[in-house]
A protein has these predicted regions:
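N-terminal accessory segments
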Residues: 2-60, 85-93
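Short, solvent-exposed beta-strand edge segments and adjacent coil->beta transition regions
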Residues: 65-68, 127-131
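Hydrophobic alpha-helical scaffolding
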Residues: 24-28, 69-72, 133, 182, ...
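Glycine-rich N-terminal segment of FAD-binding domains in flavoprotein oxidoreductases
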Residues: 38, 50-119, 155
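Generic non-transmembrane alpha-helix signal with a bias for helix starts/N-cap capping motifs
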Residues: 31-32, 79, 140, 188
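FAD-binding subdomain of flavoenzyme oxidoreductases
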Residues: 121-125, 131-239
Length: 239
């Protein structure tokens, strides 16, 4: 299963000039241009009508933020193309899985990319090394159903296993009721192939094996965490 370790998961954090983050939507003209280009340059479903956007404005949380629009990609190439278009038009992107989070991570004034419909394959199962390689939209329970005949099980057992996708769980660093014994996602994921905001496609893995730009990103995030360590410790809930 592919996903980066936590210290490597953040890429370049620079905000491009003109990008509006949070709850502010772009102009109607910009939204229309985004929809036009997505329909022309991708094979995915492009949803910019009010009812569709309304469905994606919320998740299992109490938050509600209307997205710019929605792309349901049919292949990885659609995702890469959408990121390139959004970068060109300075529109934020927001990947979405099952929308089962209770903290609002999948809501925002952005182009929502819903990976749960088509990008949900189990690409490989290595029984000898006890690993699986999957697409981000695969639901946890579906993975475990494929693993069961091999006597294997993915132990990050979130309560929403029938809806939560592996990509969303990785981004959320999910845990589950057995995390004391098995750890959370960061302890059960070996690597990830991902696109950065500039369109680069990189293979992330452990810090020990990182090189080139992947190592630079890891060092940047590590330094950022160290810089704000005292503030993080002070504000992290004591449970």
């Amino acid at each position: 299963f592919d996903h980066p370790m936590l210290t490597e998961s953040a890429a370049t954090l620079h905000r491009p000039n003109g990008v509006s983050l949070g709850t502010a939507l772009p102009s109607n003209e910009l939204s229309q241009e985004l929809a036009r280009r997505l329909r022309a340059e991708t094979e995915g479903e492009v949803l910019f009508d009010a009812p569709s956007r309304g469905r994606y404005a919320t998740d299992a949380s109490i938050y509600q933020i209307m997205p710019v629009g929605v792309l349901i990609p049919k292949c990885a190439r659609d995702v890469a193309t959408a990121i390139a278009i959004a970068r060109d038009l300075k529109v934020p992107v927001l990947p979405r899985g099952g929308g089962s989070s209770q903290c609002g991570q999948t809501t925002g004034a952005a182009l929502v990319i819903d990976n749960s419909k088509h990008l949900r394959k189990v690409l490989a199962i290595d029984t000898e090394n006890r690993t699986a390689t999957v697409e981000p939209g695969l639901v946890l329970d579906h993975l475990n159903a494929r693993l069961k005949p091999h006597g294997l099980w993915f132990p990050v057992d979130v309560s929403t296993g029938a809806q939560a996708t592996l990509g969303g769980m990785a981004g959320n660093n999910s845990c589950g009721s057995r995390s004391i014994a098995y750890g959370n996602m960061v302890h059960n994921v070996l690597g990830m192939r991902a696109w950065l905001s500039d369109g680069s496609e990189l293979d992330f893995g452990t810090v020990a094996t990182a090189s080139g730009r992947v190592a630079q990103i890891g060092s940047f995030v590590h330094a950022l965490a160290h810089e704000h360590r005292a503030e993080i410790i002070a504000r992290w809930p004591k449970v």
